């Protein structure tokens, strides 16, 4: 019998902050399970979830507006600790009898708050001391409205010159509100405050660890599928690879992995996937060479969204054909992770906009003939990687830069042709190899090469050549929501450019993309 790793759990109500998933990841890093739900949950749903504590997230709305989101009243009647962050603090103050006003000046950026009263939330936590010995905390503010009067049964714990109620608390009811964001690294002691709330005030044990998550997942897979056979589309990406390893540990030879080689992968990637999972780890793998089929379906298509849909559709067709060849397969496994689940829920409720269609969930037929196994659907990407390490997958593979589901299909601009993919593969491999050699690979968040379908004049020896152009792209980002272009050294870029032009026959010019996000996206398509 495996330990119940969901026994202690935190409920995070999402009021729309860009940092809400970060709050959840921080709680998980503390070894405690949590879930992220939209703010408008019912009392019955909260009772059913039975949380050890509740966190109210930040959000972009103004609590002073008539129809702005509110926490369900039951949150304050459930008898568990509640932690309001930014907007979450404002709605808590307002709903419990305090007052919030729209501020003339928006407070955004670093601030130093002075702790004026003792509280379980910040006791013994400080960045510096005032002249008279009061603790100071360096925090990150991002708010327009501010609390101007706290509820009568609360005390002021900390304040700044412009924000009289930076932290408020009702110690008896274990209700706490902070006007800053403890989940971002700019709030230096933020993790300690979250730990104080989750571990001490809510009394949650650290049961959510990679080894225990694996034991739990294996037990749940065995319970769900029994002795049935399972099929998985293995791409070599992080999610499908960790899914494969978990299933292999749980059901061994009853798992069949289908590896569809679509001709849109990185250099030697197909061979590496087959070597590692087939030869090294001993998984059942069906290798389907399908390059010609994908390229034929993509012929003549220039639109990025249409290309994504075609690649998704052909993958499903090929995968379905292979599944039909296997006898008695009852289950389809997928590497769906928790952000996919959150994103799909947001799309269903109309609370988010689709910028690009999501490859993992986009095209699968609604009429599923098989049951669905999704062992990673409670996990964030960083948790999936830690589990992969625990299962024996190599670090370099798990911490590789992100690669889009449609692969080179969206890194070749416009129409996708075999010639373009072959050139791009080799150019990209040189760029990545040089980044690793210069110890720059782990210093950038993502780096890749893009094929531009334009020809440019070049000089080789005594002759002129009229060949293709590629662009190098490297970015630095924390969350991939915004990104800066990476300031790679000029001599490094020169070395990469020389190697590509000299070693990849067919490329005459290399450029470097210096666009940030926004306004540009990280991928070109």
Curated annotation (Swiss-Prot):
Catalytic positions?
Answer: 86, 181, 183
Residues that span the membrane, as ranges: none
> A cellular component term (GO) from this record?
cytosol
Stored Gene3D superfamilies:
3.30.300.10, 3.40.50.880, HUPs (3.40.50.620)
**Which positions bind ATP?**
235-241
Per its record, what are the GO molecular function terms?
Answer: ATP binding; GMP synthase activity
Record keywords, A-Z: ATP-binding, Glutamine amidotransferase, GMP biosynthesis, Ligase, Nucleotide-binding, Purine biosynthesis
Pathway, per record: Purine metabolism; GMP biosynthesis; GMP from XMP (L-Gln route): step 1/1
Sequence ranges assigned to domain Glutamine amidotransferase type-1 in this UniProt record: 9-207
**EC number(s) reported in the record:** 6.3.5.2
Q: Which InterPro entries match?
A: Class_I_gatase-like, GATASE, GMP_synth_C, GMP_synth_GATase, GMP_synthase, GMPS_ATP_PPase_dom, NAD/GMP_synthase, Rossmann-like_a/b/a_fold
- Give every GMPS ATP-PPase domain span: 208-400
Quote the catalytic activity from the record. Answer: XMP + L-glutamine + ATP + H2O = GMP + L-glutamate + AMP + diphosphate + 2 H(+)
Q: Which EC class, in a word? A: ligase
Q: Subunit details for this protein? A: Homodimer.
**NCBIfam families, from UniProt?**
guaA_Cterm, guaA_Nterm, PRK00074.1
Describe the task this protein carries out.
Answer: Catalyzes the synthesis of GMP from XMP.
The protein in question is named GMP synthase [glutamine-hydrolyzing]
Query: From which organism does this entry originate?
Result: Escherichia coli O17:K52:H18 (strain UMN026 / ExPEC)
